[in-house]
């Protein structure tokens, strides 16, 4: 199917963002992300832009994953569409980006999916997940703060102090408990009051979402004995603030996750690479 090109093309049609990549070997040679309007239209726009960047090389097939893939038919802009299971794409993509053959991928998109992947992603297990993710962050932000822009929310959170809205372990018991230090969160938003600034609430939202994901990811890693191979991916992981909170949270459990470059393209990369991985 792919004999005419050394390039692999993958799309991830998400609820908010449509992403696409061109892969050569295991490296990204071109990428693009745009807001998802109508899934088929957004996919076509990304595909056209990527194809225009490599006019000299023929690409006949596009691998598609994400929730919007069900809106596509058997072809797109004259290219054969191969639909890839999203969990398989997350597994393959996470391992590819991290340069690992096995690992636990915590993929933070609108919600969060957790996948244990082995043998470069040929074998995967759905470890679980949570509805808490980037969508939670933006939804609560819009309701509580009137902010819908992720960039604006992150900037506000950096100016705020989560401890002004969160109750810490030290606040309750006066010190650490077990593996949990005194400054760790005991209850998210327990202290929120009229005196809390918009920036403090923004910081608290980041804390809550990223701590929930970090704890769930750490527990899954221990359950699957993949503590040394945890990979965090997805659009939310690209945020410096979110990634720092996730790393700090997982460190409580002795886990140092890898957050690879281009982590936001995990599913698109996995879709593209599946055209090779699942045939070998």
Pin down the residues of each PLM region:
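Short glycine-aspartate micro-motif
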Residues: 6-12, 59-63, 101-107, 129, ...
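Glycine-rich phosphate-binding loops at beta-strand->alpha-helix junctions
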Residues: 64-72, 220-249, 264
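Glycine-rich phosphate-binding/hydrolytic loop that grips phosphoryl groups
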Residues: 91-97, 137-141, 248, 255-280
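Adenine-nucleotide phosphate-binding core of ATP-dependent small-molecule kinases
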Residues: 178, 183-229, 260
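Short beta-strand-loop/turn "lid" adjacent to the catalytic site in phosphate-handling enzymes
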Residues: 35-36, 51-86, 122-126
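Short glycine-rich, Thr/Ser-proximal phosphate-binding strand/loop in the N-terminal lobe
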Residues: 3-42, 49, 123-124
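Conserved phosphate-binding catalytic cores of ATP/NTP-utilizing and phosphoryl-transfer enzymes
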Residues: 1-4, 72, 77-106, 111, ...
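Glycine-rich phosphate-binding loop plus the immediately following alpha-helix
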Residues: 121-177
């Amino acid at each position: 199917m792919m004999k005419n090109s050394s390039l692999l093309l993958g799309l991830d049609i998400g609820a908010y963002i449509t992403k696409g990549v061109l892969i050569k070997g295991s490296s990204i040679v071109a990428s693009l992300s745009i807001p998802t309007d109508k899934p088929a239209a957004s996919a076509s726009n990304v595909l056209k832009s990527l194809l225009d960047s490599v006019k000299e090389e023929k690409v006949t097939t596009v691998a598609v994953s994400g929730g919007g893939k069900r809106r596509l038919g058997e072809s797109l802009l004259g290219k054969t569409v191969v639909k890839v299971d999203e969990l398989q794409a997350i597994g393959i993509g996470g391992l590819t980006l991290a340069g690992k053959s096995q690992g636990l991928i915590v993929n933070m998109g609108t919600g969060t999916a957790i996948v244990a992947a082995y043998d470069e992603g040929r074998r995967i297990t759905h470890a679980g997940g949570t509805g808490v993710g980037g969508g939670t962050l933006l939804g609560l932000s819009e309701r509580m703060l009137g902010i819908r822009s992720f960039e604006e929310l992150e900037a506000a959170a950096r100016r705020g102090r989560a401890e002004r809205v969160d109750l810490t372990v030290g606040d309750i018991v006066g010190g650490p408990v077990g593996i949990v230090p005194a400054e760790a969160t005991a209850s998210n938003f327990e202290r929120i009051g009229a005196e809390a600034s918009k920036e403090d609430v923004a910081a608290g939202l980041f804390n809550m979402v990223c701590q929930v994901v970090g704890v769930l990811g750490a527990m899954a890693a221990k359950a699957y004995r993949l503590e040394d191979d945890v990979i965090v991916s997805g659009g939310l992981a690209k945020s410096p603030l979110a990634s720092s909170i996730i790393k700090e949270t997982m460190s409580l459990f002795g886990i140092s996750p890898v957050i690879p470059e281009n982590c936001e393209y995990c599913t698109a990369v996995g879709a593209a690479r599946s055209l090779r991985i699942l045939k070998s």
